[in-house]
Each structure stands twice: as C-alpha cells, then as structure tokens.
C-alpha cells in the first residue's frame, strides 16, 4: 500500500542509508552506491506491491528521490523496478520527465523464453529513455529469468541463459541481474534444494570460464 506519509517514508530510507553507509545506529560502512525506490508498482494485481494509483506513485517517487538525492548527491537513487510492460514503463518515464525528476538509473524486470523478446524490450527501454531526455540514464534489468517456469528443467534453459548473456553484451542494457539463486525459491533454476546443479548452472559456469579470456567475438 502507499505509505501514509511520503516524506516520512523518505526520512526512514535516509536513516537506512546512514545505517549501512555511514555507521549510524551501530551500523556499517558498506558504501552501497545504488539505492532503488520501491518494486513493481505497475503489477496491477490485488497482491501487488502498490495498491494506489499511478499518479500517487509518481508523487511518492518524486518525494523520495528529491529527499534522498538532496542528502546523498554522490549516490545513485533510482528505480522503480518496473515489471517490464512497455505501456506502464513509458507512462512512468514520461511522468518523471514532465516533473523534471532525474533518473539516476531505471530498473526493470523481464521474464521471457526467446532472445528476440529480450532484445525487443531492451531496445524499447533505451529508446524511450532517450526520447524523454534521459540519454545518460543507465537501463538496468534487475530481475531476469525464463517464463514459463516449466522450462527450467530443460536443456533449453541452459541455451536461453547463455544466449541472453551473449545478447546483453551487444544490446543497449547497462546491467543484468539474474533472479534468483536462493535455494527453494520458485525462481531458482540454478541449484536444487540439495544444492545440485540445474540446467541454468552450466550456462553460468561456462560464462565464468569465458570471461577469463577477457574479450568477446561477434
């Protein structure tokens, strides 16, 4: 649900940052650079992460961003972990541009079963950011995986994972974060509950071997 007081929520986040980066309240000095505001406000489901209106979310995001960026100009404050739907993504980017709210980074999610679908969304997000004046805003996929999930046990999972990472080297996306490898998670297709390798594991293993070579070929 939307916080009752957007400013107070931002102040709570301020102290979380101070706790983990500045040692406040018996904290730490982790120097975490990236801080994401919210998650999947555009999921549009009763059990989703945001039950308010899109306009309420835009107000909320602007309030949080301006408060945190004013205090921590050296950090990257961004988000909002969009679900990857092109229509709602464009609405969010357009709203931030209209309000003149900077986007230190734009994060979004994608679950798919073809590399073409991956390429299509990656290029859409980059094109839309550029169109609204955010040419310098990094595009970050902070959740990606296969869908439908019944493919996770197949050899196709290995191929798709490897092909997606290869495509990501040459498409306009700045970071890709695989979601996820928690043992027992619905989204985990890297290890079984006994920590045995699943199909996607071999794509990551092979990728790790290739990265030691230092260059990629086209």
Where is each model-derived feature located?
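A short helix->loop->beta-strand "cap" motif at the edges of active sites that frequently abuts
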Residues: 73-75, 134-137
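Active-site beta-strand/loop signature of hydrolases that rely on acidic residues for catalysis
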Residues: 40, 142-143
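Active-site cleft segment of glycoside hydrolase catalytic domains centered on the general acid/base Glu
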Residues: 1-105, 109-128, 149-163, 190
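Short, solvent-exposed turn/loop segments enriched in Gly/Ser/Thr/Pro and often Arg
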Residues: 81-84, 143, 179-182
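Long, acidic, intrinsically disordered low-complexity segments
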Residues: 118, 137, 166-168
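Active-site neighborhood of phospho(di)ester-bond hydrolases with catalytic His/Asp-centered motifs
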Residues: 137-142, 177
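Aromatic- and carboxylate-lined catalytic core of secreted/periplasmic carbohydrate-active enzymes
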Residues: 163-218
């Amino acid at each position: 649900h939307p916080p009752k007081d957007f400013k107070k929520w931002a102040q709570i986040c301020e102290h979380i940052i101070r706790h983990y980066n500045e040692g406040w309240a018996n904290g730490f000095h982790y120097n975490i650079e990236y801080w994401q505001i919210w998650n999947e406000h555009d999921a549009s489901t009763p059990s989703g992460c945001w039950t308010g209106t899109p306009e309420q979310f835009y107000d909320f995001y602007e309030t949080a961003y301006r408060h945190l960026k004013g205090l921590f100009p050296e950090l990257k404050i961004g988000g909002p972990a969009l679900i990857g739907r092109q229509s709602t993504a464009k609405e969010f980017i357009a709203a931030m541009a209209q309000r003149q709210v900077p986007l230190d980074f734009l994060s979004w999610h994608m679950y798919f079963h073809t590399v073409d679908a991956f390429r299509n969304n990656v290029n859409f997000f980059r094109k839309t950011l550029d169109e609204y004046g955010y040419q310098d805003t990094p595009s970050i996929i902070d959740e990606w995986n296969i869908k439908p999930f019944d493919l996770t046990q197949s050899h196709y999972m290995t191929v798709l994972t490897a092909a997606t990472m290869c495509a990501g080297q040459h498409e306009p996306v700045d970071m890709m974060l695989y979601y996820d490898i928690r043992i027992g998670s619905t989204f985990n297709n890297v290890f079984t509950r006994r920590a045995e390798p699943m199909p996607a594991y071999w794509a990551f293993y092979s990728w790790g071997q290739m990265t030691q070579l230092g260059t990629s070929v086209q």
